[in-house]
Amino acid sequence: MCIRDSRGVFVRNIPIDEAIEIFELRATMEELVGRRLAQNITATQQQEMENLVRNMERAVAATDSHAYHLLNLQFHDRLVEMAGNRKLASIYRKLVKEISLFRRLNLAGHNVLPVSAHAHWEILEAIKSGNPDTAGRVLFDHAMNSKARTIENDEQRRRAELPNDPT
C-alpha cells in the first residue's frame, strides 16, 4: 500500500519480475524459519499449527478460498513469529504484503486448495522431525512452488491477453 499526498491510498502494482525476486527472498527466509523451528518448536506451538491446518482443511471442504487464503497467511506468519527473530518477521511481513495478490491468485486454480492443505501438513511433519535440514528444505521448496505457480499464472494471463490471430 502506498500513500501519496493529495492522492490518497492505493495498492502498488508489483511487476512480475519484482514479485519473483520477492518469492525467492521469501523462500530463503522460510528455509531459515524451518531450520530454527525444527530445533525449538514447543508442543503448544505444534498444537496451534495443527489446529490452523485443520481449519485450512475445513475451508477446503467448504470451498471457501477466501478463508483458506487468510488461514494460509496466518500459518506462515505464525511460523515466522515462532522462529523468534523479530527483524526477520518484520522484513518477511513487509515482503509478503507486496505479493499478497499473487499469493491469492495462486490459490485460485482447480484442485489447488487440497494440495496446498496437504503441503502444510508436510511442513509441520518436517518441523516436528527435529531435522533442521529437512524442515528448511520443505519450507524452501514450498515457497519456490508458489513462485513457480506465480510464473505459470502470469504466462497464462499473458497468453489470454494476446489478440486472436484469424489467419
Q: Which functions belong to the PLM regions below?
A:
Residues E18, I22, R26, A43-R104, ...:
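Conserved amphipathic alpha-helical segments that form helical-bundle/coiled-coil interaction surfaces
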Residues L25-R26, L32-R35, F102-R104, V112, ...:
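Short, surface-exposed linear patches
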Residues V112-T167:
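C-terminal regulatory/effector modules of DNA-binding transcriptional regulators
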